[in-house]
């Protein structure tokens, strides 16, 4: 009985029952009734969607239970826990004799259905300013660093294979194919851990961007080496190698191009879908068109990962301006739900597939693969940072370099690629086994130890300080000044690039892609718009705090406002006085009387005068953020005290 009370046992049991029912029912033959039944059990009609729903429910419940167990989430990453659950279920299935094909994750299912929500979520919510400010460094890590890792791992393993140490004889082209799998860094596993660490923005965006684009580069090279293997090494000629190199650039940057094209199309569609009857379709366009972009990338042999990443990053700005805020909020929440569900199912199936895959164990090959992955990952990061630091203002420290090298976790994408290797490759089963061990090593050992190591090395944390209005203004001023200085010096750096992009965006792209009415509202006065946004943010912060601590300041502010109001309103026409009084009342909660009189500043009147804006902000917070006065409530006198 004590065993049944353990949450992880219940999770395994739930997923086991769901999977076993799906596996057994698919083998049952259809029986014809001899009498008319009261009810039917038509499993075959709902087998596929029901199995998907059961897996999603079971895996999601597993994640909830993990978060309820004390200290479990602090010690193990979610990815490691989900893999363990899948591994346990897979072992049980094997012991009871369930057909392994019933719980094997096909590469087509992974690449076409589970992967797109993950990469779209990463691209759509990508911190665009930091990403494009560091785009040159990220591109170097992703393209040069990944290519170096692939070639170095492959050449090292191939050179050792010439000694006859490995049990399967593998040519160089097949080793390059496996190298493209082993060098692939999984953005899902990396991003989750680094978000928990709250590392500084420079380090986070370097790891985030590199892992995101690394997938696209690795997949492009994987397909190139796979095509070379299908042609046959002995049949390759010089033009094939030249075409392969050109194809690498065409596929990678073609994927970016098709992503930008679909971002343009999505923004254009949402611009015209503004009528009440059709604007509900905006959510459909925001979700379906990027997925269509991914499929078009697959259709034309381009990098579908880069396509959907850049589609999400480029369309977000325009879609948010075209679509009403409630629809945007609901759509973005649904994107997060899809991403979380895909991530959960992938890692559970990764554990299951450990048992269901065909394996070939070669200790020497596996150990050397792990060692070479660690060595060349570290070497690539150190060498790239050495050259990049010569041209960077914010340089990568030695601690940053260590965390970047140690944080190169492998995951689901590497597994999806290795199981997609054709059966005619002699070392496929050895590659699958080695890839799974590399994933386990990085997710479990490196993933578990990354947080304590980062704390021990005192990695610089992210600055959680929220900028106020004057800081935003100074930041904009510095950007504009730096762009002007670069222009005067004749140096075209990233400030000049950003300034040129803003000019192109404001003069040409936004008039085409953004609804004119929305653009007029947005462009009335940029300073006023920025000021209003920051005032709203400051008001929310004040509302979340104890109002009593702000009472003295609020009283002085109202006295100053009334004094200025009495001065400003003199000599103004009666119509203007009415408009001005209404404006002050609606926007600032300040009542201006015809005789310029003031309300006695008793605590009750002061509270009523000063909390009009705060109450509206509190209502907004309650509606949107689930905020409930931050643990405070007001009594009849109008003062706040801590809720008991």
Swiss-Prot record:
Knockout or disruption consequences: RNAi-mediated knockdown of the protein causes worms to become extremely lean and transparent. Slower progression through the larval stages, in particular the L1 and L2 stages. Increase in average life span, decreased brood size and loss of fat storage granules in the intestine leading to decreased opacity. Reduced rate of pharyngeal pumping, reduced size of proton pulses inside the cells, increased intracellular acidification, reduced uptake of fatty acids, and doubling of the defecation period.
Keywords, sorted A to Z: Antiport, Cell membrane, Ion transport, Membrane, Sodium, Sodium transport, Transmembrane, Transmembrane helix, Transport
Keyword Cell wall biogenesis/degradation: no
Region (Disordered): 621-644
Primary location group: membrane
Positions with biased composition (Acidic residues): 622-636
Cellular component aspect of the GO annotation: apical plasma membrane; plasma membrane
Topology class, membrane: Multi-pass membrane protein
Subcellular location, record wording: Apical cell membrane
Membrane-traversing stretches: 79-99, 108-128, 138-158, 174-194, 202-222, 245-265, 295-315, 334-354, 365-385, 430-450
Family annotation (Pfam families): Na_H_Exchanger (PF00999)
Keyword check for rRNA-binding: no
Residue ranges, Cytoplasmic side: 1-6, 28-51, 73-78, 129-137, 195-201, 266-294, 355-364, 451-644
InterPro entries (UniProt xref): Cation/H_exchanger_CPA1, Cation/H_exchanger_TM, NaH_exchanger
Record-linked NCBIfam families: b_cpa1
Family: Belongs to the monovalent cation:proton antiporter 1 (CPA1) transporter (TC 2.A.36) family.
Annotated function: Na(+)/H(+) antiporter that promotes normal di- or tripeptide transporter function, recovery following the peptide-induced acidification of the intestinal cytoplasm and maintenance of the peptide-dependent intestinal pH homeostasis. Regulator of free fatty acid uptake from the diet together with the dipeptide transporter pept-1. May play a timekeeper role in defecation cycle but is not necessary for pbo-4-dependent proton release. May play a role in the regulation of lifespan independent of the stress response pathway.
Name of the molecule in the record: Na(+)/H(+) exchanger protein 2
